[in-house]
């Protein structure tokens, strides 16, 4: 991961980065994020305003954490400037989603509607009854919430019914062969 870790991180205008020991705080137009880095990794500000992630030695653990830490800090900067968004689609007869305030209510073939409460920092938007978006500034949280929603009714391989990411290709199976 050292090739990724060696790259410097550009800090755009309007983003304030505070480094306090192992804790990195990033504040931007969309919000504020903070992350505590693993022990051997340090972040320092270069003269040109960019951030550099450094490791003290070439031990295996330090090498593993070097690229990871650089990517996490870079994702925080992208999150507070642009944000992250995952789009999900619903396929199936009678399957749909509706917005109930900040939360989502799904009709997915169960005997009851399933309600998903929006965690702090996550916003839901429903474009169509079969297409909705999960958005936020924390990439990990956006992906986790989207994965938990998909887990409610994952797409099945025979008809493709269920909740899937937009653009996801579902491997289909042939149905059982009829009698001859």
UniProtKB/Swiss-Prot annotation:
Gene Ontology, cellular component aspect: cytosolic large ribosomal subunit
SUPFAM superfamilies hit by this protein: Ribosomal protein L6
Gene3D superfamilies: Ribosomal protein L6, alpha-beta domain
Pfam families linked to this entry: Ribosomal_L6 (PF00347)
Coiled coil stretches, renumbered: none
Keywords, sorted A to Z: Ribonucleoprotein, Ribosomal protein, RNA-binding, rRNA-binding
GO molecular function: rRNA binding; structural constituent of ribosome
Gene Ontology terms: biological process: cytoplasmic translation
Subunit structure: Part of the 50S ribosomal subunit.
NCBIfam families: L6_bact
Family: Belongs to the universal ribosomal protein uL6 family.
Purpose of the protein: This protein binds to the 23S rRNA, and is important in its secondary structure. It is located near the subunit interface in the base of the L7/L12 stalk, and near the tRNA binding site of the peptidyltransferase center.
Name of this protein: Large ribosomal subunit protein uL6
